[in-house]
From Swiss-Prot:
Keyword Calcium among record annotations: no
Gene3D superfamilies registered for this protein in UniProt: Ribosomal protein L10e/L16
Gene giving rise to this polypeptide: rplP
Classification via SUPFAM superfamilies: Ribosomal protein L16p/L10e (SSF54686)
Quaternary structure note: Part of the 50S ribosomal subunit.
Family matches, as PANTHER family: 50S/60S RIBOSOMAL PROTEIN L16, LARGE RIBOSOMAL SUBUNIT PROTEIN UL16M
Protein name per Swiss-Prot or TrEMBL: Large ribosomal subunit protein uL16
GO BP: translation
Length: 138
């Protein structure tokens, strides 16, 4: 699964996913992309399951780009622990995805196969998504 090799700080502040994306809003590398319509923290496991769903349908013919990476660690305190006494230990790595972010891109495959693969990947993610074409205005 995806996670940073090293970070400057182990326990970052929580970053908000509200609002619209400032960058990463259009399809740059492939022909079609999967765009988030709402913001969320996307877990490394969810990114991996979406990647597997796409690669199963591409059948070694197409090319895929993952445009998001889980840079931020989410912490959690153990069960039945009283409040206070510091922040919990890092539990998982998440990518902060805002509305309008292109998360996956695909190229070199027929349009039907691309749409099927991106739809399958969208079903693995906890947010509403749409399939966008290269050059489409957002």
């Amino acid at each position: 699964m995806l996670q940073p090799k090293r970070t400057k700080f182990r326990k970052p502040h929580k970053v908000s996913y509200e609002g619209k994306a400032k960058g990463n809003k259009q399809v740059d590398f492939g022909e079609f992309g999967l765009m988030a319509l709402e913001g969320a923290w996307i877990d490394a496991r969810q990114i991996e399951s979406a990647r597997i769903a796409i690669s199963k349908r591409l059948l070694k013919t197409g090319k895929m780009w993952i445009r998001i990476f889980p840079h931020m660690s989410l912490t959690k305190k153990p069960l039945e622990v009283r409040m206070g006494s510091g922040k919990g230990s890092p539990e998982k790595w998440v990518a902060v995805v805002k509305a309008g972010t292109v998360m996956f891109e695909i190229a070199n495959v027929s349009e039907e196969l691309m749409c099927e693969a991106l739809r399958a990947a969208g079903n693995k993610l906890p947010i509403k998504v749409k399939i966008v074409k290269k050059g489409e205005a957002n």
